[in-house]
Amino acid sequence: SGNSLNSYPAPAQPVYPAANTVVKNQNPDISISLAREPAFDPKQVEMRVSGFGLVNAQYDPKEKILKWTPSRPLRLSPVTVQVRWKNLAANLWQTATWQFGIAEQEMHFIPQNVVK
């Protein structure tokens, strides 16, 4: 089914949330470490997140980590993340893709007719 978490093998790069895990937080920091990658252009690093498309992820050149925090809760599970970066030596784009799940949230309804 489209909801299975094992559509993609875990990428070689360290990612968070970890590939094919389920998190409770609906606004998790989403990140990838590119510390082990050969030379790449930090201006040519992109992150796409399902339901959001291309996102404004921040790259930390010291830690070599690309990170993004969702501006609104992630509601569709699983979440697919795709990161692309330009390998300068090979002059090729490289891609890491992974998925993680969001645990079903308990909905807290406040009835409209309650007099406060």
List each language-model region with its residue ranges:
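N-terminal non-catalytic regions of secreted/periplasmic and cell-surface proteins
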Residues: G2-K43, A96-K116
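Hydrophobic/anchoring residues in structured secondary elements
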Residues: P17-A19, M47, Y59
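Extracytoplasmic/surface-exposed domains of secreted proteins
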Residues: N27-G51, P61-Q94
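Short, surface-exposed loop motifs enriched in S/T, G, D/E and P with embedded aromatic residues
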Residues: L54-Q58
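Residue-level structural signal for beta-strand termini and adjacent loop
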Residues: Y59-D60, Q99
